[in-house]
Amino acid sequence: MFKKALFILSLCPSFALAQSYVVYDFTHNRVLESHASDSIQPIASVTKLMTANVFLENNKNPNCRIAITKEDTDRIKGTGTKLPKNIPISCNELLKAMLVHSDNYAAHALSRAAGISRRQFIKKMNEKAHQLGMYSTRFHDSSGLSSYNISSPMDLVKLAKYSLNKSDIKRLSNLSATYIQAGKQKLYIKNTNKLVRDEIFDAAVNKTGYIQESGYNLVFINKHRCKNATIGVISLNNTSSAYRSSFTKSKLEKFGCTALNGRTIRDVAGEAQYEDGYDEVGFNTLIQKLSK
C-alpha cells in the first residue's frame, strides 16, 4: 500500500514546494512584500476564480440551468458533493456553490453550461490567462483537482485584479454562509475561508485552494481600504489551513488593514471540515481503488 502511494505521488508534476506569496497594493499597482512570488506551483481550487470569469463572460443565458451528472464526478481525488444528481440547478446557484463552498462538481457542471464543450471551456481559460499576461499559468480542468493547474503568486495578482471587475465574484467572495436551492432541496453551505466564514475580514475577492500537491492556497483582497489602499495577500503552499489564515491576517494588519470589530482567529481545530479539494479521505479512496 505504501509503495502504491509513493508511485501515485511520483506521477504528479515536480515543483519547488515551499511557501510563496505576495502582498499587493491594488490601488497603486505595487508589490508591498513578497517571497518567491514568481515560483510556479499547483494552485488547486484557486482555479475556480478563472472558471467563474470564463463562465460569466461566455454564458449568454440568464436563466441557465444544468444538472450534476456522472460526467461531473471527481475521478482524480475522490471528493464528493452536497449537490443532488440529475436535478436541474440554476447556474447562479452552482456559481455560488463553487465560489463559496468550492464545490468541484459545480465547477465541472459550469464548464458544460456556457454553450460550449468542456474542452473548449478549458481552452478559453488558458486563452484568458494569456490575455491577462499570466504566462506562467496553465489550466487542465475547471475545478483545480488536477495538479497540472499551475500558476505563480504574481500571475494570480493579475487574475485577482481582473476579478474585481465582476460584481458576482465580489458578492459571492464575501458570503460567510448561504443556502443553495437545488430542486426542492435547500442546502446550507459555509465559506471555505475562515477569515470570511468567521467574519474577521470582508473580502472583495476570495478563493481558497487545497490538494496535497499544492498545500493550502489563498487569493484574498480586502474589501475595505487599508490606509487609502486596497490590499491583497496571495499565498501558495501554506502548511495548513490554520497557518494560511493567521499568515494572511498578519500581513493584512501589517499593511494597515483592520479586522472587523477587532476579531481574532479562534477554534482552528475543526478547520478540515471546510477545506476544499483533495483531502486525506479522497487520497485513501484513490489508493484503495488503484490497489484492487
Curated annotation (Swiss-Prot):
One of its GO terms (molecular function) is serine-type D-Ala-D-Ala carboxypeptidase activity. Residues 1-18 form the signal peptide. GO terms for biological process: beta-lactam antibiotic catabolic process; cell wall organization; peptidoglycan biosynthetic process; proteolysis; regulation of cell shape; response to antibiotic. One of its GO terms (cellular component) is periplasmic space. Substrate binds at K207. The keyword Membrane does not apply. Keywords: Cell shape, Cell wall biogenesis/degradation, Hydrolase, Peptidoglycan synthesis, Periplasm, Signal. Pfam families: Peptidase_S11. Its EC number is 3.4.21.-. It is found in: Periplasm. It comes from the Bacteria. The keyword Cell wall biogenesis/degradation applies. The active site is at S45 (acyl-ester intermediate), K48 (proton acceptor), S102. Cell wall formation. May play a specialized role in remodeling the cell wall. Specifically hydrolyzes the DD-diaminopimelate-alanine bonds in high-molecular-mass murein sacculi. Belongs to the peptidase S11 family. This is D-alanyl-D-alanine endopeptidase. The lineage of its organism: Bacteria, Pseudomonadati, Pseudomonadota, Gammaproteobacteria, Pasteurellales. The gene is pbpG.
